[in-house]
Amino acid sequence: PPPPAVPLPTFDALRVSWNAGTPPGTAVEAQARVMVDGNWTSWSSFGRWSPYLEREGAAPVTKGAVNLLPDSLVLDSKTATQAQLRIYLYTKDEHTTPSVSLVGVSVRAVDVIPAGGRPINARLHLMPYAVARRAPALQPVMDLAICLASLTNRWGADILPEEFALAMRDCRSTDAERNLSFAAAAAGCWGFPCWACWGNLALLRSEVRAGYGVIVGLESTPAQQAAGMPPV
């Protein structure tokens, strides 16, 4: 039977996250589809993932209203309210299998009034990492890798930013593009539940208040991008 449909607020973009243990010789592949104008789109794959693979995110392609990017699905002039997810498990050894602990979806809701939430005072405990002092070949994704290392090492792990950078690197994309789905999967493979989502200030404050670690990426407005600022 098909997977159950996930009811969601009206949205124009979707991102899938997964956490999985993938021993050598195994991999997982998450897929999603959405309902547009009463019909399900075709399944979109976000690439096979394992820290041991030369992994590649989705190849950018446009099918009708669906624009598939390496780590997200964006609708062009359309919206959706439902999604379906599925995840495939692969192995080269019948005695070894991947294990999946989380499959999640986040959407970019439309026509939502921004919420600020209740202010919070918190002390940030940051690791003394600097992008300029890390491996030069990995610097384009090192900012996100440092964030992941800072969060996980705060809880007792001993993971180098370079290890995260290699585990989440998307070999299909340019080094300037960060694959957030692969980044969440990299944290998950070290035992830290992690997912990527769109959020606002209210969500950020509630996560901090609850004691969770949060990495924030700010999306530039079209006007800011036209002025030369990076998209994220």
Predicted regions and their residues:
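Active-site-adjacent structural segments surrounding the nucleophilic cysteine of cysteine proteases
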Residues: 90-176, 228
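Generic structural signal for bulky hydrophobic/aromatic residues embedded
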Residues: 17-19, 88, 146, 154, ...
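Acidic/glycine-enriched edge-of-secondary-structure segments
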Residues: 56-59, 135, 188-193
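Non-cytosolic beta-sandwich-type ligand-binding/adhesion modules
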Residues: 1-112
